[in-house]
Amino acid sequence: MARKELSALNIQTGPLGSDAADIIAPAAKHGLRVQNIARSFGDRQVVRDVSLNVQRGEVFGLLGPNGAGKTTCFYMITGLIPADSGSIWLDNEDITQLPMYQRARMGLGYLAQEASIFRGMSVEQNVRSVVELRHKSETTIREETNRLLEELRIDHLRNAPATALSGGERRRVEIARALAGKPSFMLLDEPFAGIDPLAIADIRQVIRYLSGQGIGVLITDHNVRETLDIIDRVSIMTSGAVLFEGTAQEAVESAEVRNAYLGEMYG
């Protein structure tokens, strides 16, 4: 399926391409669905009636300027903070009131911006420690650990201490740990933060790998260019509400989005 060039940025849409994004029904009953969620802190409403829908195999971006409410919205989806109103669904299951660990058991993986690996362990031990939570057989644990190390291309680092990893290598280990939980969706909080340009390209490959495995990916990041490069669709938030939803190409071409968020350098 052909991908549409994002001529203004010299980038391309994500692995599904905009044609695939066009056929994703907004009212689909499957996938990760967020319906009219809202959140206030005291008298200040920071998220107002936000809705979005992410399908398996799709890479979806949640973007916006500082103070737009995207981080609060993202945290409500992960279960880090509760929503005041609205609902969050994982396929046909209402997970709105479930704590974060139960959402994870149901297939909602989360990669925090902050480092989440065990610094006192090797790469292999970091991955194995999560695999052991799901399996009891030593053979299965060993095979699953090896599979994740190989698929995330960190097998050569298996004996390296976590403290010796670069930013990109650490991200790969963290994603391998998250994949050990067999998620159907992955929420990536600032995946491009704190890593160099070469590592950014590396993480983009990992995100494409996740999508290719049929895992839905929801990204929030301040690195606009890199995020638009990888996503299939995007919601742009301003002042606590969704200003725009569409493909990356459509976002770049939108005068409304440029005026509120991207700026004229994207025009």
Descriptions of predicted regions:
Residues 82, 94-114, 138-142, 212, ...:
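ABC ATPase NBD coupling module
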Residues 182:
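Conserved catalytic motifs of ABC-family nucleotide-binding domains
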Residues 139-157, 204-208:
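Conserved ABC ATPase "signature" region
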Residues 186-190:
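Catalytic Walker B motif of ABC-type/P-loop ATPase nucleotide-binding domains
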Residues 161-165, 169:
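Conserved ABC ATPase signature
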Residues 63-65:
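The feature captures the beta-strand-to-loop junction immediately N-terminal to the Walker
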